[in-house]
């Protein structure tokens, strides 16, 4: 009872108010205790046998007081519920979840015990049955049955818990076919209404609720009944129609079943609790015994409806209704005596069996111990053999490990030696890494500025792309006209040959008549020169400069960068180039001076720069293609374009502040490593052509017929003495900027090649000019050594932007200031920027000259770049031929 005392009333009742209701029925005076007579009368309504009820009473009244308090009465109710659900009647079953107990009550058929007669009236009244049938018909049954889907909404409308509705469905579906007929539906609705009236739903269907059509016959077959009747007649010696316990004791014990099971069968069959069995009850008892012996089926705790003898079905309901409220648990004295004897025999039997079991367990234990010891000895022997084999293997492995140890020690020495070398290498690499990190920080700053410049250029590129798109739109109507003009071009070929001869003749005559019509600084209008036939050849040679003008802003900070013609190869005589261009312009102007047709390619002068102030040059009045043949004469057939000296003109660096220094940075040098024996030792002009160190890429420079030194303003007249690069006799440059860009707002502007080193009056007027030869892009200078290369310089798309020989002082954001080591000049002292005298020891320091591999790499890049430029020039030549053809076609149209 200690376990029961620990349980509270809520735990015992599982929160069900039915337990409290039952207690109020017994303890009507609310005294807090229940007498034995009241408890016996109430517990008899459960329908359990007296033996089970007596056991329940003993478990509930552990103190033997003869009364029960509220908690003890709840324990008794809980044990009754366990017995009704087939569980063991013990205190350990109190913790199991069971439905509330069921007791007989005339007011509710749900609380009637499982024992019921076949003749019992159906609990569903006729008027209720009619109402339930109407609901059944409204649900449209199929073949007299309703499926669960149709019954489910009706049950859910009751608002009952789902578990209660599930139990109602299981109880009403008697044949378990998943559907309900009329009688089963009536049972379901009856249970729902009872549940709505707060009556508990039973765990099993009471016999009174079983429809008459579903009730079964008696379990004892007629053949068995006849056989058991013969045994009954032999046993009933007094011939009173009943047999007592003493009369059937020997027959029951001969079956070999336990006495407790026989007593349970006796209590089930003695439905009237009179201590005797009738003929039908005796047949039922033997039927239960035979079921246990043959099929092993245990007798139920409560008789099912089909087990109740037919003779007892009619009188059972009357006995239940009219039963006395007071009952005695030991009413049958003979049964008690028999039970006591059975208990004594069972106790003695249990003691003997216990002793025998203990001895058998001892024997088994000893045998098991011996067997375990034998197994252990066998295992140890096996383990010993394994260990010996392992010992041999380990010894062999140990010998191998000793050899490996010696080898590893030698390898360790070598590895340590290598580690020392690697550590030394790592230290040197760390030092180099530190220097590289500092350079990287510098490069990152330069990269940020370069990105800003890139964004600006990208914006300008977008604007230029829009202009190109608009130009393409204007070009589309001309393409159709070009197809028509190509046929005319073939007919013009012969005419062009005649015009070339006439052009050469006119150019010589016009040169004499217009000696002052030369180009100054290349600042002339594109429209005034576009009609010249010599311009077509120049356009092809300066396609790179034209592309640079289109991709960069019109006004540049450095004059050298704004003009793509400032870096031609030194092999061209600038005076001859200038005079040739001027001659072509003059000849075309004279031939077309009186033409009255309008030039279709003429651009409004308001969008261009002003022409050269010469009254003889009329660039805007006539069509250059009318009246003369620009291809009549060959401008390259008579004059050698390589006959002039590109350095014979004026000094273009005289206006720079760097070249106006009063001191000579090379004057302090005692000896000039580049000077000859004396000034008079210059052998010939041809020798100087081959020895010119300033010729780009080592190409041959045309000999100069002038004695002027364009570098005299920078290095002085006495720095080199006589011999190599003596430019002391060169004249001073004019104050005009020779690198001024000649740009125009027109997209098709082209800058004509001009000699930036030439003064305006150097060339003789009598000498006829010649057109300049095709000038390639100047060879780029040799790259710096690998350790001193500039990333910006190598990655820059403009090869002249960072290595411009004509830019004396870079700006504040120049890479030279950010990394002076990369951009150092081997010919300049470290203190040049402070205008101090140069250190002679640092002059011409070639210690940092690139290696042969760098020279090969540089030559490879130069070769690739020149190939790209050659292809670009070919494309430009094709474009110019197209434009020339269009111009010729337009001129033919205008003449017509």
Curated annotation (Swiss-Prot):
Reported tissue expression: Ubiquitously expressed.
Outcome following mutation: residue 169 to A: Loss of interaction with STON2 NPF motifs
Limits of the EH domain: 15-104, 128-216, 224-314
Domain EF-hand: 48-83, 160-195, 223-258, 262-292
Pfam families documented for this protein: EH
Binding sites annotated in the UniProt record for Ca(2+) 1: 173, 175, 177, 179, 184
PROSITE patterns, alphabetized: EF_HAND_1, EF_HAND_2, EH, UIM
Phosphoserine sites (modified residues): 108, 140, 323-324, 467, 470, 485, 562-563, 746, 790, 796, 814
Membrane topology designation: Peripheral membrane protein
Keywords from the UniProt entry: Acetylation, Calcium, Cell membrane, Chromosomal rearrangement, Coated pit, Cytoplasm, Endocytosis, Endosome, Host-virus interaction, Membrane, Metal-binding, Phosphoprotein, Protein transport, Proto-oncogene, Repeat, SH3-binding, Transport, Ubl conjugation
Record PTM Phosphotyrosine, positions in chain: 849
Phosphothreonine modification, residue list: 777, 779
Ranges of the Sequence repeats in the UniProt entry: 599-601, 623-625, 629-631, 634-636, 640-642, 645-647, 651-653, 664-666, 672-674, 692-694, 709-711, 737-739, 798-800, 804-806, 825-827
Domain UIM per the UniProt entry, residue ranges: 851-870, 877-896
SUPFAM superfamilies: EF-hand, Myosin rod fragments
Short sequence motif SH3-binding: positions: 768-774
Subunit-level organization: Interacts with SGIP1. Interacts with HGS; the interaction bridges the interaction of STAM or STAM2 with EPS15. Isoform 2 interacts with HGS and AP2A2. Part of a complex at least composed of EPS15, HGS, and either STAM or STAM2. Binds AP2A2. Interacts with AP2B1; clathrin competes with EPS15. Binds STON2. Interacts (via its SH3-binding sites) with CRK. Interacts with SH3BP4/TTP. Interacts with ERBB2. Interacts with FCHO1. Interacts with FCHO2. Interacts (via EH domains) with DAB2. Interacts (via UIM repeats) with CORO7 (when ubiquitinated at 'Lys-472').
Function: Involved in cell growth regulation. May be involved in the regulation of mitogenic signals and control of cell proliferation. Involved in the internalization of ligand-inducible receptors of the receptor tyrosine kinase (RTK) type, in particular EGFR. Plays a role in the assembly of clathrin-coated pits (CCPs). Acts as a clathrin adapter required for post-Golgi trafficking. Seems to be involved in CCPs maturation including invagination or budding.
Protein name: Epidermal growth factor receptor substrate 15
Organism encoding this protein: Homo sapiens
């Amino acid at each position: 009872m200690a376990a029961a005392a620990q349980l509270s009333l809520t735990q015992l009742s599982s929160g069900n108010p039915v337990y409290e209701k039952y207690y109020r029925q017994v303890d009507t005076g609310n005294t807090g205790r229940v007498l034995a007579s009241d408890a016996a009368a109430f517990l008899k309504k459960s329908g359990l046998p007296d033996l089970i009820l007596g056991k329940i009473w003993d478990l509930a009244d552990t103190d033997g007081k003869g009364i029960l308090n509220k908690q003890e009465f709840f324990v008794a109710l809980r044990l009754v519920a366990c017995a009704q659900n087939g569980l063991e009647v013990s205190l350990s079953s109190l913790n199991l979840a069971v439905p509330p107990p069921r007791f007989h009550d005339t007011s509710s058929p749900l609380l009637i015990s499982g024992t019921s007669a076949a003749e019992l009236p159906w609990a569903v009244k006729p008027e209720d049955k009619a109402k339930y049938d109407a609901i059944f018909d409204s649900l449209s049954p199929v073949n007299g049955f309703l499926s669960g889907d149709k019954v489910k909404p009706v049950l859910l409308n009751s608002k009952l818990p789902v578990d209660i509705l599930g139990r109602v469905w299981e109880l009403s579906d008697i044949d378990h076919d998943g559907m309900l007929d009329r009688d089963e539906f009536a049972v379901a609705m009856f249970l729902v209404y009872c549940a709505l009236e707060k009556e508990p739903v039973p765990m099993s269907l009471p016999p009174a609720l079983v429809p008459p059509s579903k009730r079964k016959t008696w379990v004892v077959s007629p053949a068995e009944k006849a056989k058991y009747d013969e045994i009954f007649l032999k046993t009933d010696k007094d011939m009173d129609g009943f047999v007592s316990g003493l009369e059937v004791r020997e027959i029951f014990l001969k079956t070999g079943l336990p006495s407790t099971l026989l007593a349970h069968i006796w209590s089930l069959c003695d439905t009237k609790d009179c201590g005797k069995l009738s003929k039908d009850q005796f047949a039922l008892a033997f039927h239960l015994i035979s079921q246990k012996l043959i099929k092993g089926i245990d007798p139920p705790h409560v008789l099912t409806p089909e087990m109740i003898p037919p003779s007892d079905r009619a009188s059972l309901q009357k006995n239940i209704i009219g039963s006395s409220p007071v009952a005695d648990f030991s009413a049958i004295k003979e049964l008690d005596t028999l039970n006591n004897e059975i208990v004594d025999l069972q106790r003695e039997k249990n003691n003997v069996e216990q002793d025998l079991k203990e001895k058998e367990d001892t024997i088994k234990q000893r045998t098991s111990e011996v067997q375990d010891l034998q197994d252990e000895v066998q295992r140890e022997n096996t383990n010993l053999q394994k260990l010996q084999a392992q010992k041999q293997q380990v010894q062999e492995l140990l010998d191998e490990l000793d050899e490996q140890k010696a080898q590893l020690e030698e390898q360790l020495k070598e590895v340590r030696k290598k580690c020392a070398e690697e550590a030394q290498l790592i230290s040197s690499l760390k030092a180099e890494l530190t220097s590289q990190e500092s350079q990287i920080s510098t490069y990152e700053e330069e990269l940020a500025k370069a990105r800003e410049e890139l964004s600006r250029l990208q914006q300008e590129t977008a604007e230029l792309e829009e202009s190109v798109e608009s130009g393409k739109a204007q070009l589309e109507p001309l393409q159709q006209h070009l197809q028509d003009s190509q046929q005319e071009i073939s007919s013009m070929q012969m005419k062009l040959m005649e015009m070339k001869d006439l052009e050469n003749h006119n150019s010589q005559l016009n040169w004499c008549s217009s000696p002052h019509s030369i180009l100054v600084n290349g600042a002339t209008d594109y429209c005034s020169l576009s009609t010249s036939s010599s311009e077509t050849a120049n356009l092809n040679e300066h396609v790179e400069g034209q592309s640079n003008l289109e991709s960069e802003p019109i006004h540049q900070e450095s004059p050298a960068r704004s003009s793509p013609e400032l870096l031609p190869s030194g092999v061209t005589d600038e005076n001859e180039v200038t005079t040739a261009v001027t001659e072509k312009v003059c000849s075309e102007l004279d031939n077309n001076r009186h033409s009255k047709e309008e030039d279709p390619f003429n651009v409004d002068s308001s969008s261009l720069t002003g022409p050269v102030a010469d009254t003889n040059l009329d660039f805007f009045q006539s069509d250059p293609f009318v009246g003369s043949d620009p291809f009549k004469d060959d401008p390259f057939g008579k004059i050698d374009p390589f006959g002039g000296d590109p350095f014979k003109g004026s000094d273009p660096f005289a206006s720079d502040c760097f070249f106006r220094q009063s001191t000579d940075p090379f004057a302090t040098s005692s000896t000039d490593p580049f000077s000859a024996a004396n000034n008079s030792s210059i052998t010939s002009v041809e020798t100087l052509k081959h020895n010119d160190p300033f010729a780009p890429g080592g190409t041959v420079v045309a000999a100069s017929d002038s004695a002027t030194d364009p570098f005299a303003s920078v290095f002085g007249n006495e720095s080199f003495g006589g011999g190599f690069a003596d430019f002391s006799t060169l004249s001073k440059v004019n104050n005009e900027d020779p690198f001024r860009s000649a740009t125009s707002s027109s997209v098709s502007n082209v800058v004509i090649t001009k000699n930036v080193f030439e003064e305006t009056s150097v060339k003789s007027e009598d000498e006829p000019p010649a057109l300049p030869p095709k000038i390639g892009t100047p060879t780029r200078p040799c790259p710096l050594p690998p350790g001193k290369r500039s990333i910006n310089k190598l990655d820059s798309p403009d090869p002249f932007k960072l290595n411009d020989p004509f830019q004396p002082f870079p700006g504040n954001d120049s890479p030279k200031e950010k990394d002076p080591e990369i951009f150092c000049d081997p010919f300049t002292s470290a203190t040049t920027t402070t205008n101090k005298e140069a250190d002679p020891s640092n002059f011409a320091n070639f210690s940092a000259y690139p290696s042969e591999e760098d020279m090969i790499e540089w030559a490879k890049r130069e070769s690739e770049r020149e190939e790209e430029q050659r292809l670009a020039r070919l494309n430009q030549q094709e474009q110019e031929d197209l434009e020339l053809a269009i111009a010729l076609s337009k001129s033919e149209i205008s003449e017509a």
